[in-house]
Amino acid sequence: MGGSVRDAVLGRLSTGDLDFTTDARPEQVQELLRGWAEAIWDTGIEFGTISAVRAGIQIEITTFRADSYDRVSRNPQVRFGDRLEDDLVRRDFSMNAMAVKIGADGSQEFIDPLGGMDALLAGVIDTPAAPEDSFNDDPLRMLRGVRFVSQLGFSLSPRVFAATVEMAGQIERITVERIAAELDKLIVGEHAVEGVETLCETGLAELIIPEIPGMKLAIDEHHQHKDVYTHSLTVLAQAMDLEDGDPDLVLRWAAILHDIGKPATRRHEPNGGVSFHHHEVVGAKMVRKRLRALKYPKAVIEDVANLVFLHLRFHGYADNQWTDSAVRRYVTDAGPLLPRLHKLVRADCTTRNKRRARKLQQNYDNLEQRIARIAEQEDLAKVRPDLDGNTIMELLDLPPGPMVGKAWRYLKELRLDRGPMSREEAEESLRQWWAAEQQS
């Protein structure tokens, strides 16, 4: 039922994860599954849901429900039902309110009392009942509708769109964790650009992640797009085209957020131009603040923020002018994010000037070749000082402490500047540095 039927019609069904519904109560479901399933667990027994697995196929069985909501939180007052039709009418969208009744003899009957198939074939996201009632019951459904725009490439029905615009403020009843979960599904959707556009058009983005619609206020300095917002959507689309395999959540977030620092750093220059100096620094701080507010995992926050911080670095590279030291620093600063940084930088080239676009891509090709050439001679992924902390303490007769760390950092900078050194060269350089430190 629900999403399983929808995905089966669309040819997207994963046979490893199926949803069922029944008039049997949760305790009865558990009893029936014992001896058949390889494992059974309580997914949410208070909501009537039991999960099981057999032969690698996970199933989720939920008792018919006919819930009501308190209209303050989104928590339903769960009431188990006896009729499939009552269960379907409470679903979020018509396309999710279809079921296939399976008889004991294996017979199948398609159940669609609310026009789900018509909505599905038309590519329209509509609600079984009035959208105002549905969204009052559970405001998260507004964001879920936008998520389906991204996942399926469908559009909101006129009445669902209008109700979402009118009721967008109700999303504040929802916990940030639930919102973030829907945003993730939206961002990794096959039609993520359309999803982000709908998020902004409905007014939900203004309440959830206002930095995205805020980019509409800043003109694109290259005048290739109406504004930075439109440019960022193009970068997102181009980053998606560069993905290898599965959707990359971090890359996509970095693509849509890479220029969020521009409105705050916009300056009108005396020559009539517009500048956004240090927008990558400001943008990285804004990314951390917003994603922390949405309670994203720390690793995701740091990866996205670091990509935003580094996305402009390449633009200082022109005509092979970087030293080997600068190339090493680029690789070291990016660390494991380097493959994503390559894609983000390439995606950020949105100029319609074919000559300029070709030059930018040639320059980045050259940089990647430089990186590969240096990597053949040294391990750029593990650039470390040529002497470790114990050796530093022994050579300089130092106890453990801050000065050892300072010496280590000096040697790392030296390693980045010069490349690999012999032990004798490293020791001599350290002694010279130490002599200068003692005199200062």
Predicted regions and their residues:
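Catalytic cores of the polymerase beta-like nucleotidyltransferase superfamily
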Residues: 1-440
